[in-house]
Regions:
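Histidine- and aromatic-enriched segments that form or immediately flank copper-ligand environments
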Residues: 55-75, 104-105
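A structural detector for beta-sheet-dominated domains
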Residues: 29-31, 43, 53, 65, ...
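N-terminal edge beta-strand
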Residues: 23-45
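Bacterial N-terminal signal peptides that target proteins for export
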Residues: 1-9
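Beta-strand cores of secreted/periplasmic/IMS beta-sandwich domains, seen most often
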Residues: 39-56, 78-86, 92-94
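Extracellular/periplasmic metallocenter environments
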Residues: 24-27, 74-111
Length: 111
């Protein structure tokens, strides 16, 4: 049995969408240039979707060198950032536009 490239592409897209939907969502809010909660625990070895809600009127940049993530989130906007699967440990993140106040930590714990 042979499959056309289009059918294979559709199947790959479907499987990717299923994997993305299966990732648990954790909400982070930026308010008054502070991430809330400032510490988030996630299980090791699992992909997680961070829903970052910027309640401020100004943009903020979610940045983490350890996670290799960087995303500007406009004021009053939301963004989705996928992380993981990760090994146990602490992974700091910060808001590049307000680094003194916008700081947080993703703590990855063994199941």
């Amino acid at each position: 049995m042979s499959y056309s490239p289009l059918k294979l592409a559709l199947l790959a897209s479907y499987l990717l969408a299923l994997n993305t939907m299966a990732a648990p969502t954790i909400e982070l809010e930026i308010s008054n240039h502070v991430f809330q909660p400032s510490v988030v625990e996630i299980p090791a070895g699992q992909k997680v979707r961070l829903l970052v809600i910027n309640s401020d009127s100004t943009p903020e940049e979610f940045e983490s060198y350890e996670l290799n993530r960087e995303k500007v989130i406009a004021g009053g906007a939301k963004a989705i950032i996928f992380v993981g699967p990760l090994d146990p440990g602490d992974y700091p993140f910060f808001g590049e536009f307000n680094p003194k106040t916008a700081q947080g930590l993703i703590r990855v714990v063994a199941p």
